[in-house]
């Protein structure tokens, strides 16, 4: 039976926190007889064990005097082995080590910060561990100036909650409240976010609420109610959001949302695989996450919540007042898939659902996503809803992201599969469209370093992960005869480290110039910045299409040629002026002369041009 809104909204404070010269604990362990706090010294030696007092709702609590922040501890349930606190705010020695009492103090300098405009985001996705050689929050701070000069206004961090070992994408997290120690822990994350705000850059946290990782997951030691057999996910039993005991499980998530926004000054969240967050109750957890995120922000500071969701479901971004969940955006990967089919020829797996034709690309651009209810051959059932009436900023588009690169067996960047000319054309379309663009780190110079799938699990689990990874790609014809890199090998991780030195070579510098100029145009051209603008798209024969953007009485045409030669005559009643073309030598192309002669546009091979019309 669904719980009431009132019951669900109560957020019990759990974990450990300092109160004056004491530390207070509160632990949820329903059905158990007792919970002890086990205190440790700096060398992991047990100092003493102190029982907590039973409280209501299956909780145990108590305060210990003469303790402060920095206290390290584990929890023992019914006299069993001590385990980390599932509500721990810090795990300095990893997910199996003692938890640490930490506060939220930081000398914040961002009182001026008002948060991001959800209709004007340019997102840059970063994996902290491979974004710099050091792989820490603070090591990325010097790169913020690069992002600001590029034209990025939003930094999206792959999950930073504590995960097993030192090498992981972050989606195996188990301690939601504890920023990864090898990244720099709570202090490093606060410094990065504060510095980002000083550069005018918002920070989104990638949050994983659809499952918990297996390594270091001690939740069942405290309560079986963290999970439910009522629903199942690709990772096993679902997290319990709608059955017995779910109030405290929901509180785990909602308190985590509050923490990122309030204690770390994060500007919002990217919700991983929201389609796998199963909740049959009312209100849906996704709606509560949005509500809680906004409530946690400082007065006047905007926050955004974006979901990764494969369903093409308009309800996600429909306002709560109209029966939706009220998210600001949703990942819409159909454009990525159409472009890869068109330029790289991908056709296996979910790519079988796409043609990459000019007509289908135009339809995707008109709608925001391609599937609006038609049957998916890959899934075997209908997919998608009609997006009519939704603002284009709700759709997050990309030509690369961590999934689309890292879930290829060799972590190949787009540069490995399409020509430099095609890369420039795809980039031009992405950044000139009315949708929210997402860039994957290094994309702005066409980085050549791979982004592989890597882990650092215990030996037994690691062996299973390695075997599973290789079986996953065994059925793909293009990968037969090649051995997929071992996720557990350190070299798999180090090979994925971004090489910022690539910016010094001429080809990379050309692409970087293209991205900077496109993003400057996106931020300054009235046709692109207008909130009253409209857009349309249509095919120009089998191998080309045009995206039209109209506002302020002007029209901007983004013409993309897939292959062959295009001769396109523009409206003879309008004056036409070339704004930019992707094959300009300044971007690494080979076409020095303008492709526009009078009102005739001539493009050869994969390329794109931006033309302004004025009647």
Regions found by a protein language model. Give the residues of each.
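Carbohydrate-interacting/catalytic domains
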Residues: 1-124, 133, 138-151, 410-412, ...
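Beta-sheet entry/capping signal
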Residues: 26, 153-154, 200-202, 267-268, ...
């Amino acid at each position: 039976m669904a719980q009431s809104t009132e019951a669900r909204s109560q957020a019990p404070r759990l974990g450990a926190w300092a109160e004056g010269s004491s530390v207070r604990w509160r632990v949820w362990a329903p059905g158990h007889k007792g919970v002890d706090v086990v205190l440790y010294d700096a060398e992991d030696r047990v100092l003493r064990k102190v029982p907590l007092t039973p409280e209501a709702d299956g909780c145990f609590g108590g305060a210990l005097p003469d303790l402060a922040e920095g206290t390290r501890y584990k929890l023992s349930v019914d006299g069993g082995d001590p385990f980390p606190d599932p509500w721990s705010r810090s795990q300095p020695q990893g997910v199996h080590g003692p938890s640490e009492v930490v506060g939220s103090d930081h000398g914040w300098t961002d009182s001026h910060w008002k948060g991001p405009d959800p209709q004007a985001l340019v997102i840059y996705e970063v994996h902290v561990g491979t974004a710099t050689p050091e792989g820490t929050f603070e090591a990325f701070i010097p790169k913020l100036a690069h992002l600001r000069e590029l034209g990025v206004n939003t930094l999206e961090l792959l999950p930073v909650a504590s995960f097993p070992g030192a090498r992981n994408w972050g989606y195996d997290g188990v301690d939601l409240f504890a920023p990864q120690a090898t990244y720099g822990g709570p202090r490093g994350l606060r410094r990065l976010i504060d510095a980002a705000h000083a550069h005018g850059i918002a920070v989104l946290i990638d949050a994983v609420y659809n499952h918990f990782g297996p390594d270091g997951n001690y939740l069942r030691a405290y309560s079986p109610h963290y999970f439910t057999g009522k629903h199942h996910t690709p990772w096993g039993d679902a997290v319990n959001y709608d059955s017995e005991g779910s109030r405290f499980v929901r509180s785990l998530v909602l308190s985590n949302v509050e923490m990122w926004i309030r204690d770390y000054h994060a500007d919002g969240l990217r919700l991983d695989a929201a389609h796998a967050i199963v909740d049959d109750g009312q209100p849906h957890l996704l709606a509560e996450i949005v509500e809680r995120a906004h409530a946690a922000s400082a007065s006047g500071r905007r926050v955004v919540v974006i979901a990764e969701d494969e369903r093409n479901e308009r309800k996600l971004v429909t306002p709560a007042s109209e029966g939706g969940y009220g998210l600001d955006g949703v990942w819409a990967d159909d454009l990525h898939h159409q472009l890869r089919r068109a330029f790289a020829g991908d056709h296996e797996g979910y790519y079988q659902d796409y043609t990459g034709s000019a007509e289908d690309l135009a339809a995707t651009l008109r709608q925001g996503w391609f599937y609006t209810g038609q049957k998916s051959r890959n899934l075997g059932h209908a997919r998608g809803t009609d997006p009519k009436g939704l603002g284009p900023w709700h759709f997050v588009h990309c030509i690369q992201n961590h999934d689309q690169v890292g879930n290829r067996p060799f972590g190949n960047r787009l540069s490995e599969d399409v020509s430099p000319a095609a890369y420039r054309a795809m980039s031009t379309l992405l950044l000139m469209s009315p949708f929210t663009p997402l860039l994957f780190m290094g994309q702005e110079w066409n980085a050549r370093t791979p982004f592989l799938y890597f882990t650092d699990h215990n030996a037994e689990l690691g062996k299973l992960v390695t075997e599973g990874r290789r079986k996953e790609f065994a059925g793909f014809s293009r990968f037969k005869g090649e051995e997929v890199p071992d996720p557990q090998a350190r070299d798999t991780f180090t090979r994925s480290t971004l090489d910022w030195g690539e910016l010094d070579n001429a080809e990379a510098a050309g692409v970087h110039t293209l991205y900077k100029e496109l993003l400057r145009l996106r931020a300054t051209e009235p046709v692109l910045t207008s909130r009253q603008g409209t857009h349309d798209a249509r095919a120009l024969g089998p191998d080309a299409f045009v995206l039209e953007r109209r506002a302020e009485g002007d029209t901007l045409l983004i013409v993309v040629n897939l292959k062959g030669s295009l001769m396109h005559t523009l409206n003879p009643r309008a004056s036409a002026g070339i704004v930019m073309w992707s094959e300009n030598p300044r971007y690494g192309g080979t076409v020095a002369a303008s492709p526009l002669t009078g009102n005739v546009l001539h493009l050869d091979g994969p390329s794109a041009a931006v033309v302004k019309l004025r009647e």
